[in-house]
Amino acid sequence: YENIREAYIKIFNRFGLDYRLVKADSGAIGGSDSEEFHVLADSGEDLLAFSDKSDYAINAELLVELQDDQDPSSLEGKDSPDGKGKLKLKRGIEAGHIFKLGTKYSESFNLKIQGDNENITPHMGCYGIGASRIVAAAIEQNHDEKGIIWPNSLSPYEVVIVEANPKSKENIKAKCEDIYNKLKE
């Protein structure tokens, strides 16, 4: 679980996304330590509550359930449940989800694996990352009126050299190749 969690953190960091690792509910499948990776975006489908002073973050609907409150927007500015800072609210796009299943399913299927000296019941986990959601979220965070501004780590290229008029009498192709070679250095 921890290895996958760290791998996901590295992925989101490398892509340069503004995201939060959010306490979540694993739903009907069950499990524990449920965490979702949400990329912050005004178009996000989920409302997130997070501390302005710590890593505490939770789906606002889940926090409302825990506090028997009715209105998620009422959480803005309240003390963070971890005692560090005030809560801020922002929308997020869920782009990853991890949680532990423990032995719930391996026991129900009587699944065993060979341990050092005996057969053991394995602990299971669920790990999901949405490649297309990451791309969509990156676009939400990195665009202007002219279009997409790809982060270098997601961009298919950093520079494009276009031979604008290959029929020109000037040796444009040679100039393009010269620029290309200089950029490679």
Tell me the role of every PLM-derived stretch.
Residues Y1-E185:
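NTP/phosphate- and nucleic-acid-binding module
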